[in-house]
Structure formats: C-alpha cells, structure tokens
C-alpha cells in the first residue's frame, strides 16, 4: 500500500511539472505585457469594441478595477438567483432562491470559494448554472491571476508607479489561458462520459424495477473551469464523486492535474519574469515538501481504518466510509489534499467521514492560508506574503535590512504583510467562536462533542480561506450561517487582496539593489527550509488551540 501511495504521488507531480512548464512560459509573456503569437489583431479589435484603454494603472486604479468588476458581478448574480424562476433554461421549473441563500451563493462564486449551502440539481436552473456560476468561475479565477500579475511586476519593475492594466490582463487571462484550456478539458470530459446537454431530467427504470429521476444539464463545460480555476462548486450535490461529473479514473486524474496546473505554472512564470528561474523553483520546492508530507499523513491515517468501527468489532482494515469504491482510499486521500491545498474545494469523498487525523490535515491546509500551491493567483500571492515574512525574520537574525529580489522590505511592507496574513485567522477564530456562542450556530451541528466543533471550525476555515469544501454534517442553509459565511468569504478574499495590492504599489516604486556578500540567498535549500518553517510556525501558533479542541481531542478520545 505504501509503495502504491508513493508511486501515485510521484506520477501526479511528474505529469504536473511537465504540463505546467510550457504554460508558465506563456504566462510569463503575459506578465511582461507581450501578446501571445497571433493574438494581437484580435486584442486590438476587442479593446476597440469594448472601449478598453491599454494605459497602465497605478495600484489604486488596478485595485479599483478588480473590486468594481467583482462587486458588479456579485450584484448581477444575486438578482439572477433571486429571479431564477423568471429566466429561461429552467425545465424543472425551480423557484428563485431565498435572499440569504442567494447572497451566500453570489458571494461564494464571486470570491472563488464556491461554498454550496444547496444541492445543485434541486435548486439551480441550467441558466443559473451557466450564465451565473460558470461565468463567475472564469471571472473570479481571472481576478486572482491578475492580482499576482501585478505583484510579480512590482518585484521586477524598478522606479515605476504602474502595475499594468487590469482590463487588459483580465481579458488576456480569460481569452488566452482559461478559455482554451477549459475547452480542451471539457471536450475530454465529454469523451469520457460527462454530461453536456439541456434535456429535462430523465425518468428511468433501474435494474431493480424502481423508478428514478436522473438529473441532466451542461455539466462538462462547468466542470472544466470548476477545476482549472480552483473554484470547486459542483453541478450536483455529490460534486466530483458523481459519475455524471467525474465518470472515470482518467477524468479524476485530469481533474487533480487541472487544480494544480495554473498555480504551478505561475511559479515557473515568476522565475522567468524575475530573471532567475531558481526563485520559482524555490517556491515549488517549499510547496511540494509540505504537500507530500500532508498526503502521506492522510494516506497513513485512512489506511489504518476507523477506530470506532474497530472498537465495535466491525471489519475496518481501511477507512472506506464516505469514499467512492471506484477511486479507493489512496486516490481519495490524494484528492482531498489537492483540493484543500489549493483553494478548490471539490471532493470525491466525504471529508466528514475521514478519520480524526485524516480530516485534520485538509482543515489545517486551509487554515495556513491556502498557500501550498493554493488557488489560481491567490495561492502564489499568499505564499509571497510568507516569503516577505521569512525574509524579515532572517533580516532580524543577521541584523540587516531585509531584501527580496534586490528590493528593501521596509516597515510599510511588513505592516501590510502582517495585516494580510492575520485577516483569515481572525475571521476563522472569531467566526467559530461566534457560532459556538449562539443557538443559531450550534443548532446546525449534526454531531456533538469534538467532531461537532470540527464541523464548525472546518466550515469557517473553508469560507474564510475561499476553499468551499465542507464537513457535510453541518446544516449550513440558514440565515445565520449563510450570512456569517458570506461575510467570511468576502472579507477573506478582498481583505487579503487590498493589502497585497498596496504592497505591490509600494515595491514597484523602489529600485533593485545589487546583491552583496551580506545578502540572504532566496533560492537555495536554506531559504526553502526557512520558508517552510515560517508557514508552519504561523499555522501552529494560530490554530493549535482550536485544533486541540476538535480533531486532536477526537483522535485522543
């Protein structure tokens, strides 16, 4: 079993790196504002038709464009969901959503979280899924990538005050990165058996003679960008464990690759744009080390079996509860770590049914800020915050002003870095405390004791860090939970983007200093270890007390 697990991890990472390397080169061209071959004429026509100016923006203008687009998208999606019953492509005549569920869903998809307090096949029409959720899957992913484009330019430009043009970046990312890759993935899913139609739900007779209503819909097109954009919201309630979304082991492997593809490519792109590919490889090494360790822990925990079933005398040599038999324990464990290391949240197994330690690792990966590969764009700019913190700590130890890529990291950057890093832990801990203090929060818990608290902590961690997966034992479709999680998702997304853009605005105006004998190398194994230690230290100090009350207490009980 151990050999199979290591082979699975190694194969996954090898294929991932092979695919991400050329995509990283294409992204590097876009960061450097070099159009991809053959796209200049199309861009010129589109910019002219849309009235888009390619004039560069400072950080405030760039941020305003990103915020404006997302707030407008939130409003449009909110009213679309409220009035769903008036719109076309609703063969099941599904009613509009309640205001609190519509708000939660709109915020969820605009912030790239895709938390779902509803069942897709019984709640949303085809129009809402396509024109509402799928559109936001593209736009939220493009927004995250645009932010990291701006931050990378801030590190590599000198003595400037502009970071590019947000509208140009968003258009190029959507047209030349997300759309073509998502199209290829969608066609592969269709070939493998995923649904793509507009038929009414089909009544069929099962082999047992019973009647069953099978949901239909344009699944493959949404599934592709759901994974590629690290969105994660399923067309169906069962998400990627549903055979209409994820029909074969091949589609399952491609889905995992799609989740990590752009985050990995962005690391390669960062190294190219910085003029030192070792910088990108350093980030990949740090992410990969944490990732492999976490996968190993989850696999080990799940193959030990369920101790509660063993105590009852039941056969539980491995923990298959809540897992698809066609995927098994090892693949389910790998997928769980992939989807929570990235801010995806798609699932092929019920995380609520994992063992105490097996469920704690995905929760902790979210709590450290989704920086182990992370979401498209958001994972890398989150990790860059820890890079700045690690450089600052190293500077304190050797008594020098911290530098990164030749740019001095001053008090302003460190204050903004600390603010950005503290946003999501504050939301998680305060949100979980509020839920446990109120009847409205506690009434949603299916289980008592440590596992019930773990359900609450997981939900708030998932929302604040824009992941979207859940311990499904929490009944979250209530005004209290819909509003609390919507607030966590919105602040968790834009409360980090705002200081990140402010950091970019500060760094882009600085001039790079040549390296000296006292400059800390940021591309070697020493800095990789320092960076990993910084991530672990912040995660440990912040969340160990809360984790001790939940999964650790459950494991020891």
From Swiss-Prot:
Presence of keyword Ion transport: yes
Alphabetical list of Pfam families matching this protein: KdpA
GO terms for cellular component: plasma membrane
Ranges annotated as spanning the membrane: 5-25, 63-83, 132-152, 170-190, 253-273, 283-303, 329-349, 356-376, 379-399, 416-436, 484-504, 526-546
Single GO MF annotation: potassium ion binding
Main location per the UniProt record: membrane
Its job: Part of the high-affinity ATP-driven potassium transport (or Kdp) system, which catalyzes the hydrolysis of ATP coupled with the electrogenic transport of potassium into the cytoplasm. This subunit binds the periplasmic potassium ions and delivers the ions to the membrane domain of KdpB through an intramembrane tunnel.
Oligomer status and interactors: The system is composed of three essential subunits: KdpA, KdpB and KdpC.
Name the UniProt record assigns to this protein: Potassium-transporting ATPase potassium-binding subunit
Species, as recorded: Escherichia coli O6:K15:H31 (strain 536 / UPEC)
Lineage: Bacteria, Pseudomonadati, Pseudomonadota, Gammaproteobacteria, Enterobacterales
Gene designation: kdpA
């Amino acid at each position: 079993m151990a050999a199979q697990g290591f082979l699975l991890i190694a194969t996954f990472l090898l294929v991932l790196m092979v695919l991400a390397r050329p995509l990283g080169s294409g992204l590097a061209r876009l960061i450097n504002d070099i159009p991809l071959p053959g796209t200049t004429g199309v861009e010129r026509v589109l910019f002219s038709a849309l009235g888009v100016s390619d004039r560069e923006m400072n950080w405030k203008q760039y941020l305003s464009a990103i915020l404006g687009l997302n707030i407008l998208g939130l409003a449009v999606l909110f009213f679309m969901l409220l009035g769903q019953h008036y719109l076309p492509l609703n063969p099941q005549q599904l009613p509009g959503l309640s205001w609190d569920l519509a708000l939660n869903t709109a915020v969820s998809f605009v912030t790239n979280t895709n938390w779902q307090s509803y069942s897709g096949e019984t709640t949303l029409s085809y129009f809402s899924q396509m024109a509402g959720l799928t559109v936001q899957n593209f736009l939220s992913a493009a927004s995250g990538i645009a932010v990291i484009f701006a931050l990378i330019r801030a590190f590599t430009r000198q003595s400037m005050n502009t970071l590019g043009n947000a509208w140009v970046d968003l258009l190029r990312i959507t047209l030349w990165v997300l759309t073509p890759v998502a199209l290829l993935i969608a066609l592969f899913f269709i070939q493998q058996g995923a649904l793509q139609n507009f038929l009414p739900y089909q009544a069929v007779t099962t082999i047992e003679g019973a009647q069953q209503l099978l949901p239909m819909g344009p699944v493959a097109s949404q599934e592709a960008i759901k994974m590629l954009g690290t969105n994660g919201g399923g067309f169906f309630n069962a998400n990627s464990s549903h055979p209409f979304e994820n029909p074969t082991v091949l589609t399952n492997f491609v889905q995992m690759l799609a989740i990590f593809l752009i985050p990995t490519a962005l690391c390669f792109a960062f190294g190219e744009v910085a003029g030192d590919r070792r910088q990108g490889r350093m980030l990949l090494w740090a992410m990969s080390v944490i990732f492999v360790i976490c996968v190993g822990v989850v696999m080990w925990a799940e193959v030990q079996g369920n101790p509660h079933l063993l105590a009852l005398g039941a056969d539980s040599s491995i923990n298959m509860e809540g897992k698809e038999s066609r995927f098994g324990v090892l693949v389910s464990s790998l997928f769980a770590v992939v989807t929570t290391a990235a801010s995806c949240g798609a699932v092929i197994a019920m995380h609520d049914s994992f063992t105490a330690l097996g469920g704690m690792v995905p929760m902790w990966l979210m709590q450290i800020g989704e920086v182990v590969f992370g979401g498209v764009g958001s994972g890398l700019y989150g990790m860059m915050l820890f890079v700045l913190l690690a450089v600052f700590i190293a500077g304190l130890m050797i008594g020098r002003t911290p530098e990164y890529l030749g740019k001095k990291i001053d008090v302003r950057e460190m204050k903004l870095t600390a603010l950005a890093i503290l946003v999501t832990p504050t939301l998680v801990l305060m949100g979980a405390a509020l839920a446990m203090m109120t009847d409205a929060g506690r009434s949603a818990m299916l289980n008592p004791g440590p596992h019930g608290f773990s359900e609450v902590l997981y939900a708030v961690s998932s929302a604040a860090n824009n992941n979207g997966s859940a311990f499904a034992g929490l009944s979250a479709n209530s005004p209290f939970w819909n509003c609390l999680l919507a607030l966590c998702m919105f602040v968790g997304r834009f409360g980090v983007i705002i200081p990140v853009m402010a950091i970019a605005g500060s760094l882009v105006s600085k001039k790079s200093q040549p390296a000296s004998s006292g400059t800390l190398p940021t591309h070697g194994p020493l800095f990789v270890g320092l960076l990993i230690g910084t991530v672990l230290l912040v995660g440990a100090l912040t969340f160990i007390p809360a984790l001790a009350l939940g999964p650790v207490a459950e494991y020891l009980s």
